[in-house]
Amino acid sequence: MALQSPNIADVLQRSFEDASFTARKVVGDQRELSKINKDFGQSYRFEYTNVKIKEPLMLRLDTKVEDTTLTLVLNGPTQLIKIPGLTQKQNLSRAPGRRQTPLDFGLVTPSMFKDLFVAKFVRVDRATGDYVFDLTYLPKLDDTSRHRIWIDPQKRFTTRREWYNQQGRQLATFYYEEPKQADGVWFPTKVTVKNMDNKVAGVTEYSGVRINGGLSADLFKI
């Protein structure tokens, strides 16, 4: 009798409710980042970003460039960008590839699979024992970009992610490292991105990580 393939439900971070931390740029090589795509290097122009994540699919980023503060809030498919003198609201329901999710930070949470992603088991990685899944968007969202992810089945965090565009071309590989555990959740504290020349384009480290601290939903109001 054949063994049943692992399901994404087996490795979701069900204990995750929210997280807050500071993301600090360690490496941001604009030449190598530009090989990923023309816009990818923009986030590496910030020395630090204060990040808040909350289920289901809420994100807040606060940063500063010189004397200018910038806030980005995502609540479901709605995005709000605020800088002094400008507030811009967008509905990204038809542009799911532009939405940031817990996946960007190495987490796979239940809300990602409600009206956004579909997961297909690929294999067990022989070298690491990680489960490998392909994540695609629901067909109704009309976006054929995808992610191939490696998940540690015990600690339930993403160790590696390959990013493919809508033409099926791989753009980059992300490595999620140095996980720390808090309140039953393993959370990576270092992210390295390599381009398709296998050159390190960016490195980000997370400090002051607080898991399930009870972040107010008011922080994510749009």
Regions found by a protein language model. Name each.
Residues L3-T87:
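N-terminal mature ectodomain segment of secretory-pathway/periplasmic proteins
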Residues G41-Y48, T69-T71, T87-K89, T144-R146, ...:
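Short, mixed charged/polar active-site loops
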Residues T71-G76, Q88-G97, T173-Y176, V203-S207:
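Short amphipathic beta-strand/extended segments with alternating polar/hydrophobic composition
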Residues A2-D10, R14-S15, N37, G76-R146, ...:
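Flexible, processing/modification-adjacent segments and terminal tails
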Residues T128-K221:
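Gly/Pro-enriched, hydrophobic low-complexity segments
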Residues V26-L33, I53-L57, Q100-F105, Q154-W163:
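Short, basic/low-complexity N-terminal boundary segments at the transition from targeting/disordered tails
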Residues I53-K54, V73-N75, V124-R126, I151-P153, ...:
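Generic beta-strand structural signal
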